[in-house]
């Protein structure tokens, strides 16, 4: 006799596969969890993440992840998923925005901190009224950087000519 798998078991198996980088099996388990319990924001968010990473369905993935984060706005993990969906489709600025939102809820979240660091954050110019490349900003930046006084900001997106 085969027992039915609960939504939570499917979700946990999906997380295990996701952590190992096995995206298709992760999506299958997240889909199963979502089908059993469509009201659960966590299952909905991870199902959306799986759709983005495996099937490249940005609109549906974004819809699922946003609705989950809206419902459970205090869960930083759901903002992390939103950021990962945006990153999968090249929307770096939006990803940074959602990572920061998640870190406002849980400042000690190592996964989100690491993801944010990996996106190549730059320091703000010392004198914001001067361009970043101005010699005075560059000189002051070299002296101030060792003390970590200047705040960080996202690296600008490359502009096409």
Where are these regions (language model features)?
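Intrinsically disordered, low-complexity, charge-biased linker/tail regions
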Residues: 1-12, 16-19, 70, 74, ...
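Alpha-helical adaptor scaffolds
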Residues: 12-19, 31-77, 84
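Structural signature of tandem alpha-helical TPR/SEL1-like repeats
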Residues: 19-29, 54-67, 89-101, 125-131
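Non-transmembrane alpha-helical oligomerization segments
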Residues: 47, 82, 140-143
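Short amphipathic alpha-helical surface patches that serve as generic macromolecular interface elements
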Residues: 62, 79-80, 95-99, 109, ...
């Amino acid at each position: 006799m085969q027992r039915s798998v609960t939504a939570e078991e499917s979700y946990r198996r999906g997380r295990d596969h996701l952590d190992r980088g096995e995206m298709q099996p992760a999506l299958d388990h997240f889909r199963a969890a979502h089908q059993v319990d469509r009201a659960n924001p966590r299952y909905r968010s991870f199902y959306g993440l799986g759709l983005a990473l495996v099937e490249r369905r940005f609109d549906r993935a974004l819809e699922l992840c946003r609705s989950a984060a809206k419902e459970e706005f205090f869960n930083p993990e759901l903002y992390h998923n939103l950021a990962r969906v945006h990153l999968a489709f090249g929307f770096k600025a939006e990803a940074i925005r959602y990572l920061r939102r998640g870190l406002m809820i849980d400042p000690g979240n190592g996964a989100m901190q690491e993801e944010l660091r990996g996106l190549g954050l730059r320091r703000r110019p010392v004198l914001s009224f001067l361009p970043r490349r101005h010699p005075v900003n560059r000189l002051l930046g070299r002296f101030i950087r060792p003390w970590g006084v200047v705040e960080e900001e996202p690296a600008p997106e490359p502009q096409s000519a």
